[in-house]
Amino acid sequence: MAVEISETLTFECETGNYHTFCPISCVAWLYQKIEDSFFLVVGTKTCGYFSQNSLGVMIFAEPRYAMAELEEGDIPAQLNDYGESKRLCIQIIKNRNPSVIIWIGTCTTEIIKMDLEGIAPKLEAEIGVPIVVARANGLDYAFTQGEDTVLAAVTHRCPERKSSVGGQNQPVQDEELQEFFSFLPPNDENVKKTVVGSQKNPPLVLFGSLPSAVAHQPSSELKRQSIQISGWIPTERYNNLPSLGDEVYVCGVNPFLSRTATSLMRRRKCQLIGAPFPIGPDGTRAWIEKICSVFGIEAQGLEKREKKVWDSLENYLDQVRGKSVFFMGDNPLEISLARFLIRCGMTVYEIGIPYMDKRYQAAELYFLQNTCRDMRIPMPRIVEKPDNYNQLQRMYELQPDLVFTGMAHANPLQARGINTRWSIEFTFAQIHGFTNAKEILKLIIRPLKDNNDFKNFDWTNLVRKDNNSLN
């Protein structure tokens, strides 16, 4: 197929065919991140089966999450929701003594209009333990939206930061982001001088759930640039949530946290730093440089550090350079991963993505476009809510070396001779920062190596045997 080189990114939107994990799967990693929390999923038996089986934790292991199973009487509101919720929460406090209880509302609670938001404040005042309500249900486009919803709810519980002396706010120095968020305050000429002249940078809060070992890396990288981090959302301890206010700068580490970003700006009046996400050495460098530029600090040593990482990846790059990939769309990590793979010398035919907030990912999209120009390759087509049937026809035509897909499509595609890699693996793998770039490449190289082995099974031919041959 002849591919025309496009000078700009092409965006399309199809009918959408969603085969993804339920967003309540966010409980799997958030209950481990917020160590003093307890997650209560309010849903049906199906939600319970999913929570127990797909999350890989048996009931006798006593994890810090549980199911509140809805009954038939809950549908016509014949049962007392408040009384039953109170009984469950008192039992949770008695057995686990959490600092916070997080209610996860499912599809069913949305359909029957269960008033979790109305029950929670009254019950919280009675039992004396904070109750956070998050609607992480299967009506969303991608399972990663579960974390986004929970973090957006947690931001409302962060303490209010007192204004500095004089009460003057420090508007954001991000002109690109201002174009997308018209409700942000206008730029102030004196801010840069104020920031540069101060010995300590303004409060900076990072949001996004990363393992502790991975979260330490961006913190230490910013510390090298003399930038102190005021806190993370979420924190390992609920009572250690950072203070928020109009003088606080916030920056995300994952591309699927647009609700959290909007909540931080509109509700808590924080100043959002729009930067590419720290995935891959190129993204990590751009992320740090953008934060430094907002604070009026000249980044030091990042070019040499990035080059050192690329040099250490040379053996991996030799195995992927010249290969082609196709993203079917399973979580909003696709844009960042595609940008990194293009920088590695790969060709990306199509980036399918379940949904995309162009405002929140503006810096990443701009970075992707510049990366394609620098590498002198065609701009990939970005398809939001892709139709899987149409994608399959395009895959047959393009013949990519590797397809990133959800778990529902992996085996059927493999049986038709299309090499696949589960998209969900990148959600749980350590892919952020300079040192974890090789983990991304390892995930890609493995299926490329296994491709020849699968062909030996003759999966490319669907053979129909005659019934008489069994006799």
UniProtKB/Swiss-Prot annotation:
Listed InterPro entries: LIPOR_BchN/ChlN, Nase/OxRdtase_comp1, Protochl_reductN
Cofactors required: [4Fe-4S] cluster
Pathway terms, separated by semicolons: Porphyrin-containing compound metabolism; chlorophyll biosynthesis (light-independent)
Pfam families: Oxidored_nitro
Gene: chlN
Protein residues bound to [4Fe-4S] cluster: C22, C47, C107
Record-annotated membrane-spanning stretches: none
Originating organism: Huperzia lucidula
This protein's UniProt keywords: 4Fe-4S, ATP-binding, Chlorophyll biosynthesis, Chloroplast, Iron, Iron-sulfur, Metal-binding, Nucleotide-binding, Oxidoreductase, Photosynthesis, Plastid
Entry's cofactor comment: Binds 1 [4Fe-4S] cluster per heterodimer. The cluster is bound at the heterodimer interface by residues from both subunits.
Name of the protein: Light-independent protochlorophyllide reductase subunit N
Superkingdom assignment: Eukaryota
A cellular component term, taken from the record's GO annotations: chloroplast
HAMAP family named in the record: ChlN_BchN
Top enzyme category: oxidoreductase
Location relative to the cell: Plastid, Chloroplast
Gene Ontology biological-process entries: light-independent chlorophyll biosynthetic process; photosynthesis, dark reaction
